[in-house]
Regions:
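Conserved SAM-binding motif I beta-strand of class I
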Residues: 50-55
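A short SAM/SAH-binding and catalytic strip from SAM-dependent methyltransferases
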Residues: 90-106
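Conserved SAM-binding loop of SAM-dependent methyltransferases across substrates and taxa
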Residues: 38-47
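S-adenosyl-L-methionine
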Residues: 1-27, 61-91
Length: 158
Protein backbone atom coordinates (compact mmCIF):
# COMPACT_ATOMS: atom_id res chain seq x y z
CA UNK A 1 0.00 0.00 0.00
CA UNK A 2 1.47 3.36 -1.05
CA UNK A 3 1.43 5.72 1.95
CA UNK A 4 4.13 8.36 1.45
CA UNK A 5 5.99 9.97 -1.46
CA UNK A 6 9.73 9.54 -2.00
CA UNK A 7 11.39 12.56 -0.44
CA UNK A 8 15.00 11.74 0.45
CA UNK A 9 16.38 12.89 3.78
CA UNK A 10 19.43 15.12 3.32
CA UNK A 11 22.68 13.36 4.29
CA UNK A 12 23.32 15.74 7.20
CA UNK A 13 19.89 14.92 8.62
CA UNK A 14 20.44 11.17 8.16
CA UNK A 15 23.73 11.35 10.06
CA UNK A 16 22.15 13.42 12.84
CA UNK A 17 19.26 10.96 13.17
CA UNK A 18 21.51 7.90 13.30
CA UNK A 19 23.69 9.56 15.97
CA UNK A 20 20.57 10.49 17.96
CA UNK A 21 19.40 6.86 17.72
CA UNK A 22 22.86 5.81 19.01
CA UNK A 23 23.27 3.30 16.17
CA UNK A 24 26.19 0.99 16.93
CA UNK A 25 28.39 -1.32 14.87
CA UNK A 26 26.73 -4.68 14.30
CA UNK A 27 23.22 -3.46 15.06
CA UNK A 28 20.42 -3.86 12.52
CA UNK A 29 18.72 -0.78 11.08
CA UNK A 30 15.39 -1.12 9.29
CA UNK A 31 14.55 1.76 6.92
CA UNK A 32 10.83 1.79 6.20
CA UNK A 33 10.50 3.26 2.72
CA UNK A 34 14.21 3.18 1.96
CA UNK A 35 14.08 5.02 -1.37
CA UNK A 36 17.55 5.19 -2.95
CA UNK A 37 19.24 3.47 0.02
CA UNK A 38 21.18 6.50 1.29
CA UNK A 39 20.25 5.94 4.94
CA UNK A 40 21.29 2.29 4.84
CA UNK A 41 24.55 3.11 3.08
CA UNK A 42 25.45 5.68 5.73
CA UNK A 43 24.44 3.28 8.52
CA UNK A 44 26.79 0.62 7.14
CA UNK A 45 29.73 2.81 6.07
CA UNK A 46 29.80 5.35 8.90
CA UNK A 47 28.34 3.40 11.82
CA UNK A 48 29.26 -0.21 10.96
CA UNK A 49 25.64 -1.34 11.18
CA UNK A 50 23.78 -3.82 9.04
CA UNK A 51 20.73 -2.60 7.18
CA UNK A 52 17.41 -3.79 5.84
CA UNK A 53 15.53 -1.48 3.53
CA UNK A 54 11.87 -1.90 2.72
CA UNK A 55 10.82 -0.21 -0.52
CA UNK A 56 7.49 -0.70 -2.28
CA UNK A 57 8.46 1.01 -5.54
CA UNK A 58 10.39 -1.38 -7.77
CA UNK A 59 12.33 1.41 -9.51
CA UNK A 60 13.60 2.78 -6.19
CA UNK A 61 14.38 -0.69 -4.84
CA UNK A 62 16.50 -1.38 -7.94
CA UNK A 63 18.22 2.00 -7.61
CA UNK A 64 18.97 1.30 -3.94
CA UNK A 65 20.38 -2.14 -4.78
CA UNK A 66 22.63 -0.55 -7.40
CA UNK A 67 23.83 2.11 -4.95
CA UNK A 68 24.51 -0.54 -2.31
CA UNK A 69 26.45 -2.65 -4.81
CA UNK A 70 28.49 0.39 -5.97
CA UNK A 71 29.47 0.98 -2.33
CA UNK A 72 30.51 -2.66 -1.83
CA UNK A 73 27.89 -3.24 0.87
CA UNK A 74 25.99 -6.23 -0.57
CA UNK A 75 27.05 -8.35 2.42
CA UNK A 76 25.75 -5.82 5.00
CA UNK A 77 22.68 -4.22 3.44
CA UNK A 78 19.56 -5.87 2.02
CA UNK A 79 16.70 -4.28 0.10
CA UNK A 80 13.27 -5.87 0.12
CA UNK A 81 10.95 -4.77 -2.70
CA UNK A 82 7.87 -5.25 -0.56
CA UNK A 83 5.11 -3.52 1.35
CA UNK A 84 6.34 -2.47 4.80
CA UNK A 85 3.20 -3.93 6.34
CA UNK A 86 4.31 -7.44 5.27
CA UNK A 87 7.72 -7.31 6.94
CA UNK A 88 8.71 -8.86 10.26
CA UNK A 89 10.66 -6.31 12.32
CA UNK A 90 11.72 -8.52 15.23
CA UNK A 91 15.44 -8.35 14.33
CA UNK A 92 15.51 -4.52 14.31
CA UNK A 93 17.64 -2.60 16.78
CA UNK A 94 16.74 0.75 15.18
CA UNK A 95 13.85 1.65 12.86
CA UNK A 96 14.18 4.74 10.64
CA UNK A 97 11.02 6.52 9.49
CA UNK A 98 10.51 9.42 7.12
CA UNK A 99 6.87 8.89 6.34
CA UNK A 100 3.95 11.11 7.39
CA UNK A 101 2.00 11.29 10.64
CA UNK A 102 -0.84 9.25 9.10
CA UNK A 103 1.63 6.69 7.71
CA UNK A 104 3.31 6.43 11.11
CA UNK A 105 -0.13 5.82 12.59
CA UNK A 106 -0.69 2.96 10.13
CA UNK A 107 2.69 1.29 10.78
CA UNK A 108 2.42 1.74 14.58
CA UNK A 109 0.61 -1.61 15.21
CA UNK A 110 3.42 -3.45 13.41
CA UNK A 111 6.03 -1.62 15.49
CA UNK A 112 4.15 -2.40 18.70
CA UNK A 113 3.76 -6.07 17.74
CA UNK A 114 7.26 -6.78 16.40
CA UNK A 115 9.81 -4.58 18.15
CA UNK A 116 11.70 -5.96 21.12
CA UNK A 117 12.21 -3.98 24.31
CA UNK A 118 14.77 -1.21 23.86
CA UNK A 119 14.46 -0.94 20.08
CA UNK A 120 14.85 2.67 19.02
CA UNK A 121 12.57 4.32 16.48
CA UNK A 122 13.76 7.57 14.94
CA UNK A 123 11.32 9.61 12.86
CA UNK A 124 12.09 12.58 10.60
CA UNK A 125 9.58 15.44 10.98
CA UNK A 126 6.55 13.30 11.86
CA UNK A 127 5.60 12.04 15.30
CA UNK A 128 3.97 8.77 16.21
CA UNK A 129 0.65 9.77 17.75
CA UNK A 130 0.08 8.08 21.10
CA UNK A 131 3.76 7.37 21.74
CA UNK A 132 5.82 9.49 24.08
CA UNK A 133 9.18 10.42 22.55
CA UNK A 134 12.32 10.05 24.64
CA UNK A 135 13.77 13.01 22.74
CA UNK A 136 12.53 15.65 20.33
CA UNK A 137 15.28 17.66 18.71
CA UNK A 138 15.32 20.37 16.09
CA UNK A 139 18.11 20.23 13.56
CA UNK A 140 18.92 23.11 11.25
CA UNK A 141 20.42 21.82 8.04
CA UNK A 142 22.01 25.17 7.18
CA UNK A 143 22.63 27.27 10.32
CA UNK A 144 24.12 30.16 8.31
CA UNK A 145 20.74 30.91 6.76
CA UNK A 146 18.57 29.39 9.50
CA UNK A 147 16.76 26.79 7.41
CA UNK A 148 15.69 24.23 6.44
CA UNK A 149 14.83 23.02 9.90
CA UNK A 150 13.93 19.43 10.76
CA UNK A 151 12.27 17.92 13.83
CA UNK A 152 13.61 14.55 14.88
CA UNK A 153 11.64 12.25 17.20
CA UNK A 154 13.37 9.43 19.08
CA UNK A 155 11.32 6.68 20.71
CA UNK A 156 12.36 3.57 22.64
CA UNK A 157 10.17 0.51 22.89
CA UNK A 158 9.39 0.03 26.60
Amino acid sequence: MFIAPFVPSPQTVVEYMLKLADLKAGEVLFDMGSGDGRTLIMAAKTFGARGVGIELREDLAKKAMGNIHENGLDDRVTIMNDDMFNVNLTSADVVYLYLTTSANEKIKPNLERDLKKGTRVVSHDYEIIGWRPDKVENFCENPQIGYPSHTIYLYKKP
